[in-house]
Every structure is written in C-alpha cells, then in structure tokens.
Amino acid sequence: VCCIDSGGHHTQEVYGYARERSAMGVIAIKGMGQKGKPPLGKPSKVDINFKGRAMKNGAQLFPVGVDGVKSLLFGRLKHNDPGPGYLHFYPTVGPDYFQELTAERQVLRYRNGFPERVWVKKSQSPNEALDEMVYAYAALHRMYQKYDRRSIWDQFERRNEPNKPSQ
C-alpha cells in the first residue's frame, strides 16, 4: 500500500499516478481536518468525463481523518514503556524528527459560539514527520480494508522467511 498526498500543487499528477498504479495498491489521499472522521474514509471518484460525470475507472480520492489520528498518535507518544500502543523508534532518530513530529498542538477555538479543538502548528517549524506518521496510519487502515487482518502478518512473515533447505 502506498498513499500519496494530493493536497499540494500537483493534484492532477497525483491522481494520474494513482489511477495508473491502483492495482499495485497506490492511492491518492487528502487530509480532512474534521472531528469524527475515520482514519481512512470511503473514496470518491475524482476523474470526470466531458459530460461532467465520474469516470468508471477514474482515480479515487481517499479522505484521511487527520484530527482523530493525530490525537491517537499524540496519546501513544506519552507511553513510556513498550506494550500495546507504544510507538517504537530507531535509536538513530534525531531530535529534529521529534520536533517535526510534535510541531502541532491542539487548541480550543470558538466557532459560531461553540467550542472546538483544532490542531495548529506551534510556529513556522516543519511538520512533515507528523504528516507522514498520520498517512502511514492511513496506509495501515487501507491494508485492513484490503486484507484479512489475521493473515496480514502471516503473509508478511512467510514472504520474509529465509528459504528453508529442502530435506
């Protein structure tokens, strides 16, 4: 599974790339900052024909519920001991990565008189590591949608097992 963010300057190129490689698991995604959205939502068709109708085999855009995933990840960053929910990092990961990973925070804002929590960047610091972590979580959910969860790791282990000598 490969997720490509389509929310930048090359949206149509991303759609074309994902369309041509959809059989290989490449999908176009776009972060949606709304409360209650699933980690990876139902795709919408984004390619239209000359009549303005969605093309049958056109590119699909998968929405990613970034607010919920960020809350989940920030909760998991608080785990100090390995176990369920703990995030593992290579020892070589430097402080710059963790600054990017924690470059946003949740603040309380009022919209139409009602309070809501929104994610905002702490400063002008980059947040690419956080975006990548959110999209990696979305890719995991795509795997859950496509494959039997119980067999994902079995398939992975079989594929990566060294060849056993025949007896």
Task: Please provide the spans of the model-predicted regions.
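Mg2+-dependent endonuclease catalytic cores in nucleic-acid-processing enzymes, primarily RNase H-like
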Residues: 1-112, 159, 163-167
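Extracellular low-complexity, Gly/Ser/Thr-rich intrinsically disordered linkers
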Residues: 99-146
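Acidic two-metal-ion nuclease catalytic site recognized across multiple nuclease folds
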Residues: 114-115, 142-167
